[in-house]
Amino acid sequence: MGVEQILKRKTGVIVGEDVHNLFTYAKEHKFAIPAINVTSSSTAVAALEAARDSKSPIILQTSNGGAAYFAGKGISNEGQNASIKGAIAAAHYIRSIAPAYGIPVVLHSDHCAKKLLPWFDGMLEADEAYFKEHGEPLFSSHMLDLSEETDEENISTCVKYFKRMAAMDQWLEMEIGITGGEEDGVNNENADKEDLYTKPEQVYNVYKALHPISPNFSIAAAFGNCHGLYAGDIALRPEILAEHQKYTREQVGCKEEKPLFLVFHGGSGSTVQEFHTGIDNGVVKVNLDTDCQYAYLTGIRDYVLNKKDYIMSPVGNPEGPEKPNKKFFDPRVWVREGEKTMGAKITKSLETFRTTNTL
């Protein structure tokens, strides 16, 4: 049996019970689904193509800045206008094209800090309008990252929004503890090292507050991870996720070995064993952004370097002064090279996360 057998909707954007069943199946079968940050139709189809060819589910997500870029850099982001419109545009685009790839897709929004809550509000309003018309939210899930705030404010704000989301059977991802580095709206580059490791009690406090509302939530607990790539050693300790599972299991008194759905942030540069340790301890989603950005660049960079004598002018190249160069500078040609290398990176990650051939 594979993923398709446990889903009501086999292809395209999945929501509600299907999202919960997908993550449950992933946890039980010890694989994680990569979440790819998309900033354009090009990056979206690169991810969809890689997942299709690997017979895998995929998560596509927009960050606050990525959503604004999707809308167009010429649009003002005052009041989160561009980020709201861009996220909604990306969602509708992905909903329209994803079924053509024949795989299940989770449509997600990435880190939303306190100062970005107007963006979250705008997306939720779009969800509720879509729900009123179609009986399901526009997005499968959203993430609140209030890790800069006190745990009390973090959790209480998540509770407030989660009640609203639960009415649409929507998934919530939240972050407790600090992931190092910098991500849209949250900068923890100078965080104290001890703060980079979430404690079991913190995780249980989240579970205790959210589970009575709905079981549809996941927790990004910090274990020394950092967003982006940084020189020097990063002391990742994904094994501590087992302590979170054990503590919550004992507090709840449940028989389920891993009651928590966990998320791996800041995975750039992590080893295969570190990923596997996290996945074995309940990680069902791994964020991929920095590595994919660089992979996308490499295809375009190498194309430009290899074809430089064919793209210096519209006409004239080493084959002759009158030879046209349109087939070399056509964006459909060189952008495609970025899609190929980004797709190759995602394909490799799907293998690392044990997601390949899970459909």
Curated annotation (Swiss-Prot):
<feature type="modified residue" description="Phosphoserine">
    <location>
        <position position="83"/>
    </location>
</feature>
<feature type="cross-link" description="Glycyl lysine isopeptide (Lys-Gly) (interchain with G-Cter in ubiquitin)">
    <location>
        <position position="73"/>
    </location>
</feature>
<dbReference type="InterPro" id="IPR013785">
    <property type="entry name" value="Aldolase_TIM"/>
</dbReference>
<keyword id="KW-0479">Metal-binding</keyword>
<comment type="function">
    <text>Catalyzes the aldol condensation of dihydroxyacetone phosphate (DHAP or glycerone-phosphate) with glyceraldehyde 3-phosphate (G3P) to form fructose 1,6-bisphosphate (FBP) in gluconeogenesis and the reverse reaction in glycolysis.</text>
</comment>
<feature type="cross-link" description="Glycyl lysine isopeptide (Lys-Gly) (interchain with G-Cter in ubiquitin)">
    <location>
        <position position="85"/>
    </location>
</feature>
<feature type="binding site">
    <location>
        <position position="111"/>
    </location>
    <ligand>
        <name>Zn(2+) 1</name>
    </ligand>
</feature>
<dbReference type="GO" id="GO:0061621">
    <property type="term" value="P:canonical glycolysis"/>
</dbReference>
<dbReference type="Pfam" id="PF01116">
    <property type="entry name" value="F_bP_aldolase"/>
</dbReference>
<dbReference type="GO" id="GO:0006096">
    <property type="term" value="P:glycolytic process"/>
</dbReference>
<feature type="cross-link" description="Glycyl lysine isopeptide (Lys-Gly) (interchain with G-Cter in ubiquitin)">
    <location>
        <position position="27"/>
    </location>
</feature>
<feature type="modified residue" description="Phosphothreonine">
    <location>
        <position position="179"/>
    </location>
</feature>
<keyword id="KW-1017">Isopeptide bond</keyword>
<dbReference type="InterPro" id="IPR006411">
    <property type="entry name" value="Fruct_bisP_bact"/>
</dbReference>
<dbReference type="GO" id="GO:0008270">
    <property type="term" value="F:zinc ion binding"/>
</dbReference>
<dbReference type="GO" id="GO:1904408">
    <property type="term" value="F:melatonin binding"/>
</dbReference>
<keyword id="KW-0597">Phosphoprotein</keyword>
<comment type="subunit">
    <text>Homodimer.</text>
</comment>
<feature type="binding site">
    <location>
        <begin position="266"/>
        <end position="268"/>
    </location>
    <ligand>
        <name>dihydroxyacetone phosphate</name>
    </ligand>
</feature>
<keyword id="KW-0324">Glycolysis</keyword>
<feature type="binding site">
    <location>
        <position position="227"/>
    </location>
    <ligand>
        <name>Zn(2+) 1</name>
    </ligand>
</feature>
<feature type="binding site">
    <location>
        <position position="265"/>
    </location>
    <ligand>
        <name>Zn(2+) 1</name>
    </ligand>
</feature>
<feature type="modified residue" description="Phosphoserine">
    <location>
        <position position="63"/>
    </location>
</feature>
<feature type="binding site">
    <location>
        <position position="175"/>
    </location>
    <ligand>
        <name>Zn(2+) 2</name>
    </ligand>
</feature>
<dbReference type="GO" id="GO:0005737">
    <property type="term" value="C:cytoplasm"/>
</dbReference>
<keyword id="KW-0456">Lyase</keyword>
<feature type="binding site">
    <location>
        <position position="145"/>
    </location>
    <ligand>
        <name>Zn(2+) 2</name>
    </ligand>
</feature>
<feature type="modified residue" description="Phosphothreonine">
    <location>
        <position position="150"/>
    </location>
</feature>
<dbReference type="InterPro" id="IPR000771">
    <property type="entry name" value="FBA_II"/>
</dbReference>
<feature type="binding site">
    <location>
        <position position="228"/>
    </location>
    <ligand>
        <name>dihydroxyacetone phosphate</name>
    </ligand>
</feature>
<comment type="similarity">
    <text>Belongs to the class II fructose-bisphosphate aldolase family.</text>
</comment>
<dbReference type="GO" id="GO:0006094">
    <property type="term" value="P:gluconeogenesis"/>
</dbReference>
<feature type="binding site">
    <location>
        <begin position="287"/>
        <end position="290"/>
    </location>
    <ligand>
        <name>dihydroxyacetone phosphate</name>
    </ligand>
</feature>
<comment type="pathway">
    <text>Carbohydrate degradation; glycolysis; D-glyceraldehyde 3-phosphate and glycerone phosphate from D-glucose: step 4/4.</text>
</comment>
<protein>
    <recommendedName>
        <fullName>Fructose-bisphosphate aldolase</fullName>
        <ecNumber>4.1.2.13</ecNumber>
    </recommendedName>
</protein>
<keyword id="KW-0832">Ubl conjugation</keyword>
<feature type="modified residue" description="Phosphothreonine">
    <location>
        <position position="290"/>
    </location>
</feature>
<feature type="modified residue" description="Phosphoserine">
    <location>
        <position position="147"/>
    </location>
</feature>
<dbReference type="GO" id="GO:0004332">
    <property type="term" value="F:fructose-bisphosphate aldolase activity"/>
</dbReference>
<feature type="modified residue" description="Phosphotyrosine">
    <location>
        <position position="310"/>
    </location>
</feature>
<feature type="modified residue" description="Phosphoserine">
    <location>
        <position position="56"/>
    </location>
</feature>
<dbReference type="GO" id="GO:0005829">
    <property type="term" value="C:cytosol"/>
</dbReference>
